[in-house]
Amino acid sequence: MAATYTIKVSGAFSAAHRLPGHPGPCASMHGHNFEVMAELAAQTLVSGMVADFMDVRAALDACFARLDHACLNDVPELSPPTAEVIAAWIFGELRARLEDGRVRVAKVSVVESEGLAASYAETP
């Protein structure tokens, strides 16, 4: 059985959104301090690491630059702007920036509010 190493890097951004057609209060504009956790995996290490934490942080920060203090309804890729859709979008952005044949993005989780989170992962 092959061993897998993983690392996790987290960050946060603040944004507003609304969920049109939602039967509850989320149909109205409201905001969150979103927390994001990205998990990367590799079966081999380079210089003892899956990836440099700072490289992963920079890739996350590039995502946050597009989302922080924005209205997520104005970001076409985030339709509808649910935590699940945000997690999938960040996953794709990180995959494009960080995957190299050795390292893969394993999972991205987005915490919308305390105790409420969604994750996106793809089977390798």
Give the location of each predicted region.
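Charge-rich, low-complexity N-terminal segments
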Residues: 1-124
